[in-house]
């Protein structure tokens, strides 16, 4: 397949085989989009920068941390990003993709069936507020992330209960302020977590600024979290 329209910043991060899988994924998402409105980010830089690059660069940026061969959770996976992107670039990891909308998880299941992923991939239609109180899911993941779901403090309440001790949460943010940093520190203190690292990047092709906040579980999160559906969003810790 042609790759002249793929930004060089992406080509430097992934292999030829991975490029082919991302192109195949793009085709399948477009086909599903004709039946189900999954995402508007399917063409050109919208796909290659806002979906692919944005999903994978955090796992390349923190070079002191091994993200391979892990149990990975994507909360609110939507059309499969960043979870399926991580799956392509980390084929030895086990992947869990959860979303509360059945049309989204049905579509992701089709993508998983049609594309030759090497991973063991699980797709679950439920809310993290429910799953986090199930023993088979809680404290069960090395890495958990979510993209475009809510503010960092709310997202941390979703992520920390799912992590194993010393597991990592990857928070995708736009601009990052001192007040947001203070709010997050306060929340993490309650949830038995800490900020491990932070990186900022200007996305290729003028797609804006992206901050990644890497959080880590210090101890198991108190069992009362996350709170019932709606409360983390309406009343952040």
From Swiss-Prot:
UniProt superkingdom: Bacteria
Residues annotated as binding S-adenosyl-L-methionine: 76, 81, 128-129, 147
Any Pfam family matching the protein: GidB
E.C. designation(s): 2.1.1.-
GO cellular component: cytosol
Keyword Cytoplasm: yes
Annotated keywords: Cytoplasm, Methyltransferase, rRNA processing, S-adenosyl-L-methionine, Transferase
Enzyme class: transferase
InterPro entries: rRNA_ssu_MeTfrase_G, SAM-dependent_MTases_sf
A Gene Ontology molecular function term of the record: rRNA (guanine-N7-)-methyltransferase activity
Record localization: Cytoplasm
Biological role: Specifically methylates the N7 position of a guanine in 16S rRNA.
Family from the record: Belongs to the methyltransferase superfamily. RNA methyltransferase RsmG family.
The protein's name: Ribosomal RNA small subunit methyltransferase G
């Amino acid at each position: 397949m042609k790759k002249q329209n793929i930004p060089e910043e992406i080509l430097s991060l992934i292999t030829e085989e991975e490029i082919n899988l991302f192109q195949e994924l793009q085709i399948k998402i477009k086909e599903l989009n004709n039946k189900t409105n999954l995402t508007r980010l399917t063409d050109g830089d919208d796909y290659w920068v806002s979906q692919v690059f944005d999903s994978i660069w955090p796992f390349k940026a923190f070079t002191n941390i091994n993200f391979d061969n892990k149990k990975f959770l994507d909360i609110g996976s939507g059309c499969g990003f960043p979870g399926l992107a991580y799956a392509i670039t980390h084929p030895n990891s086990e992947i869990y993709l959860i979303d509360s909308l059945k049309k989204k998880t049905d579509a992701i299941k089709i993508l998983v069936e049609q594309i030759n992923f090497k991973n063991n991939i699980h797709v679950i239609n439920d809310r993290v507020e429910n799953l986090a109180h199930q023993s088979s899911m809680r404290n069960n993941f090395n890495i958990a992330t979510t993209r475009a779901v809510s503010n960092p403090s709310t997202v941390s309440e979703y992520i920390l209960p799912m992590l194993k001790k010393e597991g990592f949460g990857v928070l995708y943010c736009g601009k990052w302020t001192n007040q947001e940093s203070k709010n997050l520190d306060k929340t993490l203190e309650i949830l038995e977590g800490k900020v491990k690292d932070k990186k900022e990047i200007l996305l290729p092709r003028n797609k804006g600024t992206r901050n990644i906040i890497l959080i880590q579980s210090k101890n198991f999160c108190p069992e009362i979290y996350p709170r019932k559906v709606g409360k983390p969003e309406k009343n952040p810790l």
